[in-house]
């Protein structure tokens, strides 16, 4: 029973093993065979799978014994269910799939004592090209396709048309994104503005003379400028006081002029033909004096106004005379 059981277990282990890969990594431990002998044997063994490259390297263990590594690359995947398929004489080969052929080849060649090589090595992610055939044309990536479209498209319509013909699936599922990118690459050109009301003659300009209103109302002199123009003014405070006095005097004369004009209009005074305004008339004096002073204040130089010190002396002498 045990024999039958053991034989059944052995058959079960053989049935469970399966190797199917185009790149095979083999290790023969404690194997003194020559690399060339192993390589030629593997080439004949896998002829039906069209071997493209075989590399066999012999190394020494730390105890001085030999062991061999082999990298086998075939055009067709090498398929077997026999775990002793790659055995050579009495030396059993450890079978592994070489998922990264670059790393396997680098590992095999780390410290070779003897090496045998046949065929053309196929780097990772590159298909094998048999001798006499040209490599297949590389298919451009989506990034390369879009870069080509953006470089050559000249309008929004042409851009969307090229995307539709080059990337139909992406155009059908992501059309809103392509429409947005088209609007950014080819924005609408703003039309030049046209005034609905064409320009006409200068009929809306103000005909008032601003200068006549500006001088009596917004005539301003800074204390610094007044101090420079008036030699008798020795300080900034004195200049401010003089300017305030001038402002008060001007306003007082303007008010008297308005009162005199209103009084004359209310009494209905009529000028006699040929008679000029006389200094004997009280109203005439006031109007004449007011107009004269206003013109004088608005046209005379600032240097004609007395400084505060002189004005104070005049005010005191006038008070004594009045007393």
From Swiss-Prot:
Cofactor: Mg(2+); Mn(2+)
GO CC terms of this entry: host cell cytoplasm; host cell nucleus
Motif (LXCXE motif, interaction with host RBR1): 204-208
The keyword Transmembrane helix belongs to this UniProt entry's keyword annotation: no
One GO term of the biological process aspect: symbiont-mediated perturbation of host cell cycle G1/S transition checkpoint
Top enzyme class: hydrolase
Motif (RCR-2): 67-69
EC number: 3.1.21.-
Annotated keywords: Activator, Covalent protein-DNA linkage, DNA replication, DNA-binding, Endonuclease, G1/S host cell cycle checkpoint dysregulation by virus, Host cytoplasm, Host nucleus, Host-virus interaction, Hydrolase, Metal-binding, Modulation of host cell cycle by virus, Nuclease, Nucleotide-binding, Nucleotidyltransferase, Repressor, Transferase
Motif (RCR-1): 25-28
Co-factor: note: Divalent metal cations, possibly Mg(2+) or Mn(2+).
Binding site for a divalent metal cation: 59, 67, 69, 111
Coiled coil: none
Localization, UniProt: Host nucleus; Host cytoplasm
Region annotated Oligomerization, chain positions: 181-193
Xref: Pfam families: Gemini_AL1 (PF00799), Gemini_AL1_M (PF08283)
Region (Disordered) location: 256-286
CRESS-DNA virus Rep endonuclease domain segment(s): 18-121
GO terms, molecular function: DNA binding; endodeoxyribonuclease activity, producing 5'-phosphomonoesters; metal ion binding; nucleotide binding; nucleotidyltransferase activity; structural molecule activity
Motif (RCR-3): 107-110
Active site: 107 (for dna cleavage activity)
Protein family per UniProt: Belongs to the geminiviridae Rep protein family.
Domain-related comment: There are 3 rolling circle replication (RCR) motifs. RCR-2 may be involved in metal coordination. RCR-3 is required for phosphodiester bond cleavage for initiation of RCR.
Oligomeric and partner information: Homooligomer. Interacts (via LXCXE domain) with host retinoblastoma-related protein 1 (RBR1), and may thereby deregulate the host cell cycle. Part of the C- and V-complexes which are RepA-Rep-DNA complexes involved in the c-sense and v-sense transcription.
Protein name: Replication-associated protein A
